[in-house]
Amino acid sequence: MVLDPAHGGTDTGARGTAGIRESEVVLGFAAQVRHALESQGFQVVQTRLADENPSFDDRSALANAQSGAVFVTLHVSSSGLPGTARVYVNSDLPMGRESNGLIPWDRAQAPFLGLSHKFGDMVQGNLAQKFKGSPGSAQTCPIRQLRTTAAPAIAVEISSVTVTDRAALDRMAPGIADAITRGAAAFRPSYVVASQSGALR
C-alpha cells in the first residue's frame, strides 16, 4: 500500500476559516491509516512523513516502483458535506501506447481503471456504513495525482475544512482507517488474480 497525504510544505491545500489546514490534517490521518493497515499485515510506504511537498511525479514514481501496490491519496474537502467521506477514481483515460508499445506516463492509470473502480467501491461501501450521508459507491473525477499512477488508485476526500471543530474532524480518523483497511483486504484477492492472469500487461 502506498499512502499519500496530499499537499505539504508551502502547499497547505484547502484552508478553513477556523485555521484547519488540509495538509496538516491528512498527515495525522495517514498515521492512523498506516497503523490500521500494518496491523492487518499490509506493508505501507508513505509519500511523505513530514511537512514537505513531493511533486506529483515523485509521488507517482514512488508508487510505480512498488510491485503489486495499491495507491490511496488522502484529502480534506474544501466544500464537502461535513462528517462524510467520499472516494474518487480518475475519469476514463484513453489507453493509447507509444510506437514502442509503452504506455505514456500521463496515461499510466488507464490499464488499472477497472481495478481502481472496484477498490474504490469497496472502500466507499465501508465509509457509507460509518459516516451517514456518504455515497454508496466511488465517484469519478479528473485527478492529476492518480493519472500517472500505474496501480489501482483512489482518492479519499474527508469531511470539509469548513468545520469549526477540529476535534470532531480528528475523531473521524479511526473510521477512515478501518474503512480503507477493510476495503484493501476485500480487494486484495481480485488484484492478485488480475496480476497473475496477465490482464495488466
Describe each model-derived feature in a short phrase.
Residues A6:
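Extracellular repeat turn/loop positions enriched in glycine and acidic/polar residues, especially those
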Residues G13-G28:
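Glycine- and acidic-residue-enriched helix-capping/strand-helix junction motifs
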Residues E24-R201:
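Active-site-proximal helix/loop segments of hydrolytic enzymes
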Residues T10-A14, T164-D165:
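Short, solvent-exposed loop/turn elements at domain surfaces
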